[in-house]
Amino acid sequence: MVDNRLSPHGGKLVERVLDPKEAPGRIAGLKTVPVKGQTVRECVSLAYGFFSPLEGFMGRADVDAVVNKMQLASGYVWSVPLVFDMPKQQIDELEIRTGDSILLTFREKPLVILEIEEIFTYDKELMAGKIFGTTETKHPGVRRTYGYADHFLGGRVTLVSEPIIREPFKRFWKPPAVLRKELAAKGWERAVAHQTRNVPHTGHEWLMKGAWFASQATGVLVNPVVGEKRAGDYIDEAIILGQDVLREAGYFREDVHAVSLLFWDMRYAGPREAVFHAIVRKNLGCTHHMFGRDHAGVGDYYGTYDAHKIFDTIPDVGIYPVLTKEWYYCPVCAGITYEGLCGHQKSKQKFSGSVIRSIIQDGVKPPRLIFRPEVFDVVMSAAEEYGFGSPFVTERYLAEAQPVLTMPDVKK
């Protein structure tokens, strides 16, 4: 089943957010279940339509279709399960039944109403093997899957209130309905999306510029993922501000570059996650999505360009994949060049994220040819203001940094 380009996946943008006047009456008397982290972020993204056509967490039929056929029960392409897990003991203690509505809360504030349509179990090893191509627990996505509780609750979610987004993320929070209007106002008839979880070096910059040329796009939408962090990752503040300064410093014109955030916890599902990213950016209003080497990969679980090949095996999802190889520095050409264009193969120098990170860790400004000085300055400023002195996630950051989103009280 294929729907039209420029329309949301499934043809209709989901938006399930209560009017503030309705909220007190709708949540009165509901059983409450506290949630955190991944579940909070997915609830917000579901309610605002980032994951259209999903209106909530999947039931068994959808999970089964996604796991085995890479599609929803309705027939639309979908590649990654979205589930809400709960231990049977908790289900029994709260006397939760199919047909009930429960209130999920975050930090003791109302988050979403979950209308329970189904309570079911699923083979987590089967799920992991099909989605990630492995059942090895050293794969982070497999560990996440095995960490789910023994039961799942499927059903629609409705956001109780608009979330509060803290600085510096507030201006980058643009739900699909808002972002689509902004892209239309910019006149972006052809928008190419860039998925990232990194501070940009010039290899990333040229990946974006190359995709812009290749797709004949009107603009580039940089859409960093904000989700679970591990020690050693770049802090989210450095990532999103570093991406934004590329435009502010003139490396992209004001009218061809924009940044917005996506609440999503990476699954590292390689080619399957590439399909998921394409669908989400389609919902944001993009017509194209760039995919470079090792997209959404981890370790050596996937081939370098598996995320390219998968689009030849699935039905058209309504967004054009822009498949790019590698940009690197050539000392003979004295500049950044593209795989297959430059003839100095023996001289090419690949961008090393680990080397760049070690230079930044020492507080040394890398050569501008591989890392823009304005990006470095913004990253170091973010380290001081948000990272307790480090541009990388530390144990202190994990313990003390405030969540990117919180929920307000519901006024009666």
Describe every region a protein language model picked out.
Residues M1-K412:
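Active-site cores that bind ATP or allylic diphosphates and position pyrophosphate for catalysis
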